């Protein structure tokens, strides 16, 4: 009976299963960090991927062999217009021992952002006149009283925020993306006051992050469609000789006759997976698009017109895709100052 004479590690990571399409284009993080801050703040932000370029900067890693020298650094550009908090959601432990929403509070100031009706159609009924807005406030004031009376039960607050894609003509869409962002730092009372104060107001990325710090990136990877085991799991192709009449770009066997084990590589969906990348450094936050726009604009995107962010290295996702930026859950290093950039490539990317 034939058998393998050489050993090799199994192909494919079990930590990335199931390899299926993401259920949402802008996923909410499943984990949030605990920050040491007396003042409450949002723990995340949303941006749109533009493309990549490169810069030259002074290396400021303490133990790096090139510390203090000029180095080449590829960077990813994200366009980050302000976000708008729409509603406050309070989470408490339910009967099953899991955190769950006990209620949510909406303010009439949130209704000034009219594009929200493209996502939540029922809100349009409260935009008819002042009397409708008054009834809207009366309806949710009782829920605000419920939050204040159960402040000791609440484990954390989250804000339902909306992006403003209308400010980015390159996206070609008006419907905003909605996502929950948790509030961290301070006491529960100060977090509640902070949330009520910023409802309906624009929040910029400088209110959440600063230059030079590390962040986590959560998003959906590029979709590749249906792929075979060679590309999907990096399985070694079988040798091509005259007795291999059943193909080479496949596995030798799927297992015993009783069934196929779950860990056996098989063809299927590749890409469009929800993934998280840790500790991406913010190289720069800029308000002048001309400092980053190359000649002719970014290929398959166009021209940056709002506040932008430069992230060290590459990140997941295709161009124009929403990307969630989160405070790092396990930062590898804390930088005190942003790096010094000496050159930004603005040459045309169109060849």
UniProtKB/Swiss-Prot annotation:
Family under the similarity heading: Belongs to the universal ribosomal protein uL3 family.
Keywords tagged on the record: Ribonucleoprotein, Ribosomal protein, RNA-binding, rRNA-binding
Subunit structure: Part of the 50S ribosomal subunit. Forms a cluster with proteins L14 and L24e.
Region listing for Disordered, in residue ranges: 1-31, 246-271
Gene3D superfamilies documented for this protein: 3.30.1430.10, Ribosomal protein L3, domain 3 (4.10.960.10), Translation factors (2.40.30.10)
Any GO molecular function: structural constituent of ribosome
Pfam family, any one: Ribosomal_L3
Cellular component terms (Gene Ontology): cytosolic large ribosomal subunit
Protein name, entry field: Large ribosomal subunit protein uL3
Organism of origin: Saccharolobus solfataricus (strain ATCC 35092 / DSM 1617 / JCM 11322 / P2) (Sulfolobus solfataricus)
HAMAP family: Ribosomal_uL3_A (MF_01325_A)
InterPro entries given in the database record: L3_arc_euk, Ribosomal_L3_dom_3_arc_sf, Ribosomal_uL3, Ribosomal_uL3_arc, Ribosomal_uL3_CS, Transl_B-barrel_sf
Job description of the protein: One of the primary rRNA binding proteins, it binds directly near the 3'-end of the 23S rRNA, where it nucleates assembly of the 50S subunit.
Superkingdom, natural source: Archaea
BP GO annotations: translation
Gene responsible for this protein: rpl3
Coiled coil: none
